[in-house]
Curated annotation (Swiss-Prot):
PROSITE patterns: SIGMA70_1, SIGMA70_2. This is RNA polymerase sigma factor FliA. Its main location: cytoplasm. Residues 197-216 bind DNA. Residues 175-223 are annotated as: Sigma-70 factor domain-4.
Length: 230
């Protein structure tokens, strides 16, 4: 098959990968931008593919397409500073509330401390969690491995693994055990069982966005507890 035929045959793969990636990103990320980057990735795959290396073209093309899309996202620093700032503010508020009450803070209590309503609080959880989950899934797709062998320099990709490293491990395990049951289950199903958000939602009988919020809140709660203990 010549290069032009190869390109035409695999163009639909670009859209497939773009749609898969878009669902994990904020609404501000345009599908057209992903398609354009993915198209460049496919073009590179067509130009550089060597069948003598023994890799199927589909496998090689997917790697190039995803890589080009991820490069585009990294170059644009897609997670706005406001998202990072909000994440820090939520973690700080949660720490203060739990320190004062001596128990896990409810969503309403954290929202009240931040002087925002519950809807706005849950949107912050959703936005910040998209960043965390995207980073982890990006790492997992690039390396094709599970959580355990996280490479040095990728500690932000898996927030739970990062917390478990070093001398914090026992404290983190104890903090996880003290989490509200649903938050603990989300972490277990996502990081250990490697279920996606839709599958976890089916287990908990909630929507994907609610799973995302629970994950975000669990990670922030863990960090708040560790800060309280330090």
């Amino acid at each position: 098959m010549d290069k032009n035929s190869l390109w035409q045959r695999y163009v639909p793969l670009v859209r497939h990968e773009a749609l898969r990636l878009q669902v994990r990103l904020p609404a501000s990320v345009e599908l057209d931008d992903l398609l354009q980057a993915g198209g460049i990735g496919l073009l590179n795959a067509v130009e550089r593919y060597d069948r003598l290396q023994g890799t199927a073209f589909t496998t090689y093309a997917v790697q190039r397409i995803r890589g080009a899309m991820l490069d585009e996202l990294r170059s644009r620093d897609w997670a706005p500073r406001s998202v990072r700032r909000n994440a820090r503010e939520v973690a700080s508020a949660m720490q203060k509330v739990e320190q004062r009450l001596g128990r896990p803070a409810t969503e309403q209590e954290v929202a009240q401390n931040l002087d925002i309503d519950l809807t706005e609080y849950r949107q912050i959880l959703l936005d910040t969690n998209n960043s965390q989950l995207f980073s982890y899934d990006e790492w997992r797709e690039e390396h094709g491995e599970s959580v355990e062998p996280m490479l040095e320099g990728h500690e932000d990709a898996n927030p739970l693994q990062h917390l478990l490293e070093g001398n914090l491990r026992q404290r983190v395990i104890e903090a996880i055990e003290a989490l509200p049951e649903r938050e603990k289950m989300v972490l277990t199903l996502y990081y250990q069982e490697e279920l996606n958000l839709k599958e976890i939602g089916a287990v908990l009988e909630v929507g994907e966005s609610r799973v995302s919020q629970l994950h975000s809140q669990a990670i922030k709660r863990l960090r708040a507890r560790l800060n309280n203990d330090s």
